[in-house]
Amino acid sequence: MGITVLKNEGLDFHAKISTPLSEIDDDMQKELLDLTKKVKIAGFRAGKVPVSIVKKKYGTSIRNDIIERRINHWVNHVIKEHNLNIIGRPKIEELQNEPDKALEFTVKIEILPKITIPDLKKISLDRPKLEVKPKDVEEQLEKLATLTKSYTKESKVTIKDGDQVTIDAIGYIKDKTFDGGKLNDLKVVIGSNTLIPGFEKQLIGSKTGSEIDVNVTFPENYHAKDLAGKDARFVVQIKAVHTSEPTLIDDEFAKKFQSNNLEELRTHFAKQIENESEEAINTIMKMNLFDKLEKLLDFDVPESLLEQEKNILKSETDKDESLLKDKSSKEITEYYNKLALRRVRIGLLLAEYAKSKNLQLEPDDFKKVIIQQARNFPGQENMIFDFYKNNPKAIEALKGTALEDKVVQYIFNNEIKLKEKKYTKEELEKYLEEEEQRITLI
């Protein structure tokens, strides 16, 4: 057996390996002899089948198995001998596997870079902190009171803000109907902003039995991309109009929502308002940390990981073409290259950090990720939980996200300096919106 190192620089290791024909033949002869003792072939007694017959029938498959084992053996030998920290599967090229010649092949191996973890204690970040004001809580109470109103009194006068209207509607774009444009017995409270912007306002002043045209424009960020930004006309039938009595917000109101009194419900809402902002804050904090890390990392990364990440990026941007619609092909290529490099470097660093701190994933880490995903599907949470409960492989696919979240949280708690920065609800909403726009392409 001979090993010739062809390349050992950067993250690439290439070697040419050869095994004498005599070794292959020896293995072949041994396995053929073993098989003659076990194989059953018509016309021969058990254990008395000639080697030549066994070779004719099974020789090719036996030789292929031997070659595969030999290749695996010598590749593993090279990896151990040169102490290679490999990534992915070694590539076998230039395979010479002729029956009358020595086995020869070239193995190409990608190596993980040596990663030096930077001094994370030198990193400092602002941590947004929401200051919940009494007016924020009162707004939530008012919304709850509005949502739980009982609309029992039918109105015979014209529609006004706050009325509940039952409608049928058919939507048209350029005088043609479209999928999802038909509404039947839809109940909507005027002013709730449940429908497309401008829709509800145009119903004001109409009466039960009226038929009116409502002209709207679908928002640019509308979830149905084929409708986003388009003008539409809805022919609306007003089927019924109902009003409600004002809801008194007091202790009795609070008891309807598992609170002993109004003050307890206020406390609950204050905590809920604070918690609702935490997930968005954590996402932005993570991206801000990654911004800092990106400037500290300059190691080379394996080409295979880079290409894999570029493909993921392409699939992400293909789902939302608006992300790169104003960029040239050169700018798009540069974007993919830069962002893929950032993601791979940070991913490798976090994995190395987890190893250095012996951070292990536990069931609760996966549970947190699943809960986060379920929040993206309001009303379908149980379906998401059931999906992961019944699909262990799907849970395994969350491993990368779960580890990233765990490591980032550990770094926040034990490494970097966090300076609390207080925001009002309005200030925080503006900050989060601006930051979310910035990190959309990260």
Curated annotation (Swiss-Prot):
PROSITE patterns: FKBP_PPIASE. GO terms for biological process: 'de novo' cotranslational protein folding; cell division; chaperone-mediated protein folding; protein transport; protein unfolding. Gene3D superfamilies: 3.10.50.40, Trigger factor ribosome-binding domain, Trigger factor, C-terminal domain. Its EC number is 5.2.1.8. The keyword RNA-binding does not apply. Pfam families: FKBP_C, Trigger_C, Trigger_N. One of its GO terms (molecular function) is protein folding chaperone. It catalyses: [protein]-peptidylproline (omega=180) = [protein]-peptidylproline (omega=0). GO terms for cellular component: cytoplasm. Residues 162-247 form the PPIase FKBP-type domain. Keywords: Cell cycle, Cell division, Chaperone, Cytoplasm, Isomerase, Rotamase. It is found in: Cytoplasm. Belongs to the FKBP-type PPIase family. Tig subfamily. Consists of 3 domains; the N-terminus binds the ribosome, the middle domain has PPIase activity, while the C-terminus has intrinsic chaperone activity on its own. Involved in protein export. Acts as a chaperone by maintaining the newly synthesized protein in an open conformation. Functions as a peptidyl-prolyl cis-trans isomerase. This is Trigger factor. The gene is tig.
